[in-house]
Amino acid sequence: KGGNIIALAQELYCSDYVPYLLQKIEEQTPYIRPVSFSFGKQSFSEPSFQQLDIVLLASPALLTYLQERGINTALAKRECKEARFTHNGKRYFAIAFPNISGGYEIRNRYFKGCIAPKEISHIRQSGKPRSACYVFEGFIDYLSFLTLRLENCPQSPDFDRQDYIVLNSVANVSKALYPLGSYERIHCFFDNDRAGMEAIQQIRK
C-alpha cells in the first residue's frame, strides 16, 4: 500500500470519516517546515568511533531535542538507546536506534550517521505472527508515527497490532524484501519524492 495521505491519517486519527481527516491534515500542514543541521565537514564513519558505549537513553539534551521534534520521550526511551563515543579526541553523545545486525543509526541535534554495520531495523511483536507490517524510511519517522498514534488514540493506540520495518535509508529497500515477503499487507510511509516512489515500486514487484 503506497503513500496515501488519507490512509495515513486514518491510521493516525483512528477514523474513517474523510471530512474530519482532511481537517486534521490541514491543521497539521502549516507547522511542517524543513530543518537542516551541519556539523562541519566531519564524517562519522565507523572506524572513527572510539570508546563507544551504548547506554539507556537519558541525556537531557537528547530528550529535549526529541521533544522539539514532537517525539514522545517515553516512547523514544523504549525504542532507542544512547551512544557515547569519542571522535577526534572529543566526546559526543547521540540517540542510537538499533538495527538487525548489531549496528545503530545515530542522531543528535547536529549530525546523523551510523555505527556499522548499516542495516534495516525489524520490530516484531511477540506472540502470534502479525499479518501486516508498516515500513518507514527512518527511525524519526517511526517515532513520529508512534507519537501521533498515541496522542490521537490514547486509550487504544494498538502499537502491537502490526510489525514494523525501518529502512534506515531507502538504499536498504532490497534488504527488506525478504522479511516483507511473509506479510499479507504492507503499508509504506515514505517521503513523496522520487526515492520514496522508487522504493515503493521495488516493494510492489
Predicted regions and their residues:
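Short, basic/aromatic recognition patches
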Residues: 72-90
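Short, aromatic/basic amphipathic alpha-helical patches
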Residues: 177-179, 198-205
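Serine endopeptidase catalytic core focused on the charge-relay Asp
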Residues: 63-75
